[in-house]
Structures are given as structure tokens and as C-alpha cells.
Amino acid sequence: MTGATLTVRVIRNFEYRTLKNVVFHDIDLATTTVDQFKKIIDERIQTDPSLKIYRTTHFDTLKIYVKAQQHKTQNLAINLDHDDWILNDGAKTLSLCGIENETELSYFELAAYKAYQANPVQKWL
């Protein structure tokens, strides 16, 4: 499918749930690779004024949060289940990774995710 719409949760901090949802339109799932999509996200972070506070964070990992028409998790920032949904192969196209139109993804720093996964405490409450 061409022209997919994807929502990406750009996560700066897990504990304080500092995140911003960013919508990307017209993404060609059949030809866009994971690494290319990360570059598209990084470019948006660097140019969109609403994402200014995210520019100093090192983002390196994409993970599927939820596929279209499926149940969301209780954690509104990240899906702590399904570590197999982390998109490790940057050369794979998005469609080969199981991404469909209206899939929601999380974009974050892997080291911060692993630390939060080991101790999932929310400090913003």
C-alpha cells in the first residue's frame, strides 16, 4: 500500500511520560525502509518548532505500539510487551516489518527503554 498514515510517539522520557504524537502522511510502506523512516522522523524533529525540546535527545529505536484496529496497552507511552515488535533491521521495508496503514509506533532511546522496562515507575503522577 502506498500513502499510509502513521502516528509516531516521540518519547523523550518514560518516567515523566514526556512524549509527543507526530502524524506522518503519505508514507510508502512498500519502499520506505526502517532507517529511511527514522531519518524522516529525525528531520521532522529538527524542523518542527513544536518538537524543539526533543532535539537534544538521541533517538535510535522504533517499536510498534499498536496496529490499526487493535487494543492499546495500559501504558500510554510505550508497549512494554512484544519486544519482538522492535524494528531492529534498518534495511527492511516497513511493510515487511508488519506495519500497515494507521499503525502507531514509538520512537525512543533504547537504553532508556531498557531501564524503564526493568523498573516501570511513573514519576509524573
Curated annotation (Swiss-Prot):
GO terms for biological process: 'de novo' protein folding. GO terms for cellular component: cytosol; nucleus. Belongs to the UPF0538 family. This is UPF0538 protein C2C4.04c. It comes from Schizosaccharomyces pombe (strain 972 / ATCC 24843) (Fission yeast).
